[in-house]
Amino acid sequence: MGPPKKSRKDRSGGDKFGKKRRAEDEAFTQLVDDNDSLDATESEGIPGAASKNAETNDEQINTDEYGAKDYRSQMQLRPDHGNRPLWVAPNGHVFLESFSPVYKHAHDFLIAISEPVCRPEHIHEYKLTAYSLYAAVSVGLQTHDIVEYLKRLSKTSIPEGILEFIRLCTLSYGKVKLVLKHNKYFIESPHPEVLQKLLKDPVIQKCRLIRSEGEDFIQGTLDGKAITQFGTKLPPGATDKPTPDPAAAAGADGTTAVPEDITDFYEKIDKEEEDEDEANLKTVSFEVAQEKIEVIQKRCIEIEHPLLAEYDFRNDTNNPDINIDLKPAAVLRPYQEKSLRKMFGNGRARSGVIVLPCGAGKSLVGVTACCTVRKRALVLCNSGVSVEQWKQQFKMWSTADDSMICRFTSEAKDKPMGCGILVTTYSMITHTQKRSWEAEQTMRWLQEQEWGIMVLDEVHTIPAKMFRRVLTIVQSHCKLGLTATLLREDDKIADLNFLIGPKLYEANWLELQKKGYIARVQCAEVWCPMSPEFYREYLTTKTSKKMLLYVMNPSKFRSCQFLIKYHEQRGDKTIVFSDNVFALKHYAIKMNKPFIYGPTSQNERIQILQNFKFNSKVNTIFVSKVADTSFDLPEANVLIQISSHGGSRRQEAQRLGRILRAKKGAIAEEYNAFFYTLVSQDTMEMSYSRKRQRFLVNQGYSYKVITHLKGMDTDSDLMYGTQEEQGQLLQLVLSASDLDCEDEKLPGEPGYRPSGSGGAVRRVGGLSSMSGGDDAIYYEHRKKNIGSVHPLFKKFRG
């Protein structure tokens, strides 16, 4: 085999940024490798209440032979249980009937106080956690409101252990806020006794800033009105309040089906929130020294009173406003408005995370947040492609132009002076190696700025230590994290709750699909039988070639080719994903399709993506895991997965998101997008596939199993149909190197080796390899013409 040939384009254009990229990649990898070793400092920023778990309450519960728990002794059924929508189990799990007349109210309430576990069509499951209750308090819900409304919604009595758990987790959360007001930092609370308790602590006493002798608490009111409208104004006479649902007040027979105590109390909570938003809340506060902010935050967490960060951006006169507004064409959908109301509920900007499905308009939410704050904005992305896409999103939805938006990547460094929005990547900010002079100047300017808002795209990918490094480099008043999948296969996702802020809002995928905001997707798992020769080798080999054998299965290749051909005839746009680069190249080259993977240059990526979007002759592209996140391809409506990263639930959801964008002008069918996973039968790939599907199944999606593709056997145009062709493919797979058998490693992943790094590589080859005959190329080295030389120098060189 030997190393692949290097094209003239790679040799000429690739060297320009090669050293710079390698240095950045090594720095990125080092940061993430450091994150794997968790030390004591990792848990310093987490309150003790966050470690509490409601599931410990049911350790003594009796179970039957099938493992079902008997909760009858703790949950007494109420007489009117048929009119109430949910059960609250002693282990903190909550079950909601989605067909209940008060489903909408109960759903909004549960999203605020709990984490969704599983949301199929009829019964939804949620889970009360310490973090979810922390998030509930942060958006204004009080302990007694949570307890009282749960009691009114529940079909049974609430177990005492759950009530105690809620009180423990919400007792001290949300009582104290850190506010930047008139360019000064204040610790603010509506509860004077809480501030008195804080000031008894010697560490916080030293951080207090006293302007005059005998100064007591500063009295004040929360005088900022809630921002309830974003984007396009409503027509005269219209209201932005949701209209009451007649079905919520009446049953099928026209009689009142909903107990009055539910609707009355919900209206009471709404009224209380409105009153708070109308700025009549009395507060007390004291000023603290700016240089002591980090010390105060850490100490408040230790004494179980974590500070909620809020930015009073309308009273910030130190940082100039930037001239940016939403365009009239930017109309927000209801769920986008709801998520932003959670962020700007009391006229200030709360830091936190918003979770929306891929294709549901996360970028527009980020752009709207920046237009609302109207201060300098910093947007952090995963890749250079997403930097370009964010720039286009700002130009599409807002009045920002090229002069206001600055890109800062290894290949595009715009001049930052005078710009109001900087878009860059995480690796550019956290890079520790030597930079170019131009990059050094931009970094110095970036660090000197006081950013009003920092938007973190795909926030779930940020390891804790790496994000902490971003926080130490960048000064920002408000942090907004955006993601579609707030989950990781490790437990580090919980760190985001206190590094950024609580989860502010999470949308329901199936509801958005029913309303047409995202595509209606048919998910299918295609079973591909292993050919006898491939399966024999699969059973006998004990090396990493097992994975390559089931990915390169001839039956899988033929299924992929058949599906591509079928959907191209329909006029569909298809993306084929493969984590394994050896398979990616082989499939793409054999089918004569363009492909994108790690080493593909930025310009080539953009060219391929533009052709895919606008060229009717390019209907299929092959991509590696580089396209898992931040690739905006609204035209794609078919996705075929031939190789994946083990049992990663997050990757499955992110890939589905590539085709989730609502389809304009689609044929009126039951489904307008298709997601295929090709799986080799009787291999470990089937086990991985089951694990990967868990998250999407919990969102309400179902997978159709296809064991036979009708018409594939009679199609003579498909490759690898004969035993001879399959034998040649098997020899190609067996002669592949160990490196070819591995999945692609991207910067930031364990085991990533930057291109050009040293180290021995094991390869399989013939005798010609030993003589250096593999992939030999002729190359001329020409000396640069240095022009005329002075006679004096000629004399010395002679």
UniProtKB/Swiss-Prot annotation:
EC number from the UniProt entry: 5.6.2.4
Transmembrane annotation, as ranges: none
Motif (Nuclear localization signal): 6-22
Annotated keywords: ATP-binding, DNA damage, DNA repair, DNA-binding, Helicase, Hydrolase, Isomerase, Nucleotide-binding, Nucleus
Domain Helicase C-terminal: from-to ranges: 558-713
Gene Ontology annotations for the cellular component aspect, listed alphabetically: nucleotide-excision repair factor 3 complex; nucleus; transcription factor TFIIH holo complex; transcription preinitiation complex
Every Helicase ATP-binding domain range: 343-504
Location(s) in or outside the cell: Nucleus
Stretches with biased composition (Acidic residues): 33-42
Pfam family of the protein (one): Helicase_C_3
Residues annotated for ATP binding in this entry: A360, G361, K362, S363, L364, V365, G366, V367
GO biological process, one term: nucleotide-excision repair
Catalytic activity entry: Couples ATP hydrolysis with the unwinding of duplex DNA by translocating in the 3'-5' direction; ATP + H2O = ADP + phosphate + H(+)
SMART domains tied to this protein: DEXDc (SM00487), HELICc (SM00490)
Bias (Basic and acidic residues) ranges: 10-25
Short motif (DEVH box): ranges: 457-460
Span list, region Disordered: 1-62, 235-254, 746-765
InterPro entries (alphabetical): ATP-dep_DNA_Helicase, ERCC3_RAD25_C, Helicase/UvrB_N, Helicase_ATP-bd, Helicase_C-like, P-loop_NTPase, XPB/Ssl2, XPB/Ssl2_N
PANTHER family assigned to the protein according to its UniProt record, in alphabetical order: GENERAL TRANSCRIPTION AND DNA REPAIR FACTOR IIH HELICASE SUBUNIT XPB (PTHR11274:SF0), RAD25/XP-B DNA REPAIR HELICASE (PTHR11274)
Assembly behavior: Component of the 7-subunit TFIIH core complex composed of haywire/XPB/ERCC3, XPD/ERCC2, GTF2H1, GTF2H2, GTF2H3, GTF2H4 and GTF2H5, which is active in NER. The core complex associates with the 3-subunit CDK-activating kinase (CAK) module composed of CCNH/cyclin H, CDK7 and MNAT1 to form the 10-subunit holoenzyme (holo-TFIIH) active in transcription. Interacts with PUF60. Interacts with ATF7IP. Interacts with Epstein-Barr virus EBNA2.
Chain's role: ATP-dependent 3'-5' DNA helicase/translocase; binds dsDNA rather than ssDNA, unzipping it in a translocase rather than classical helicase activity. Component of the general transcription and DNA repair factor IIH (TFIIH) core complex. When complexed to CDK-activating kinase (CAK), involved in RNA transcription by RNA polymerase II. The ATPase activity of XPB/ERCC3, but not its helicase activity, is required for DNA opening; it may wrap around the damaged DNA wedging it open, causing localized melting and twisting that allows XPD/ERCC2 helicase to anchor.
Similarity remark: Belongs to the helicase family. RAD25/XPB subfamily.
Descriptive protein name: General transcription and DNA repair factor IIH helicase/translocase subunit XPB
UniProt source species: Drosophila melanogaster (Fruit fly)
